[in-house]
Amino acid sequence: MGIRAIVVDTAGTTTDLSFIKDTLFPYSAKALPDFLKENEHNVLVENCICDVRDIALEPEATLERVIEILQQWVAEDRKSTPLKTLQGLIWKQGYAKGEFTGHIFPDFIDAIEGIKQQNMRLYSFSSGSAEAQKLLFSHSDAGDLTPNFDGHFDTRTGNKLFKQAYCNIINTISLAPKQVLFISDVIEELKAAEEAGMRTLQMVRTPGQRTGTYKQISSFAELTF
C-alpha cells in the first residue's frame, strides 16, 4: 500500500528549534502582558482567559494572575491550548509588523515540489496552534508555502505523545494508516504514530540527537517513495 499523505512535525523537522526557542517564544513572552491587557475583551482572547482559569482551577483569577500563570506555562513549555492560541495571535502581530520571518529548512522547501508531483497530500502536526503553523509557513523565508498544505493539526487533535491523536488524524484525512507517513525528530511522537499504524521516519538533524530503532533521514532530500 503506497504512501498517499505525509504529516510533518514542525520544530526540529521543518523548522530550526532555535527559531522557536530563541525568537518566537521570547517574543510572545515579552508581548503577552500588554497583549492581554489590550485585548481582554476580544472574544477569542476572553475565551482563552476563561480556559486558563479552568485549567489552573482558579475561576476567580484576576487578569494579572492569569498573566502569571501563562508566563509560568511558557517557562515550563506547557502544551496548553489557550497558551498556544494566544502565542499564535501574538506571533501574527509580529509577522505582520515584519519583526521576523518563519524559518524553514531549505531541504523541506525543495522537497515540497516532489511531494506534490507525486500527488501526495501534505499536512503539518504541531503542539503550536494551527493558526501559528499557517503563520510560520505563510511568512517563511521562501514566501507563502501554505498553498502546498492540505491541512494543519494541533493540540485540539490530541496530544502528540499519544496514539489517539494520530488515530484522529487518520480518521480526519480518511486514509488507511499505512498510507500515511509521519516525520518527526521526537522518538515518543514516532512511537505514538507507529502504534496508530502510520509509517514513520525520524528526522535527525543534529549530532548527539536521541535516536531509536526508526528509519532515519537527516534531510528531506533523502525522501524516497
From Swiss-Prot:
InterPro entries with a match to the protein in the record: Enolase-ppase_E1, HAD-like_sf, HAD-SF_hydro_IA, HAD_sf
Disulfide bond sites: none
Enzyme nomenclature, EC number: 3.1.3.77
GO BP: L-methionine salvage from methylthioadenosine
Keywords: Amino-acid biosynthesis, Hydrolase, Magnesium, Metal-binding, Methionine biosynthesis
Cofactor(s) this protein cannot do without: Mg(2+)
Top-rank lineage group of the source organism: Bacteria
Residues in the signal sequence: none
Gene Ontology MF annotations: 2,3-diketo-5-methylthiopentyl-1-phosphate enolase activity; 2-hydroxy-3-keto-5-methylthiopentenyl-1-phosphate phosphatase activity; acireductone synthase activity; magnesium ion binding
Enzyme superclass (EC): hydrolase
Cofactor note as given: Binds 1 Mg(2+) ion per subunit.
Annotated transmembrane regions: none
Reaction(s) catalysed by this chain's protein: 5-methylsulfanyl-2,3-dioxopentyl phosphate + H2O = 1,2-dihydroxy-5-(methylsulfanyl)pent-1-en-3-one + phosphate
Pathway noted in the entry: Amino-acid biosynthesis; L-methionine biosynthesis via salvage pathway; L-methionine from S-methyl-5-thio-alpha-D-ribose 1-phosphate: step 3/6; Amino-acid biosynthesis; L-methionine biosynthesis via salvage pathway; L-methionine from S-methyl-5-thio-alpha-D-ribose 1-phosphate: step 4/6
Summary of subunit composition and partner proteins: Monomer.
Protein's job: Bifunctional enzyme that catalyzes the enolization of 2,3-diketo-5-methylthiopentyl-1-phosphate (DK-MTP-1-P) into the intermediate 2-hydroxy-3-keto-5-methylthiopentenyl-1-phosphate (HK-MTPenyl-1-P), which is then dephosphorylated to form the acireductone 1,2-dihydroxy-3-keto-5-methylthiopentene (DHK-MTPene).
Family: Belongs to the HAD-like hydrolase superfamily. MasA/MtnC family.
Protein name: Enolase-phosphatase E1
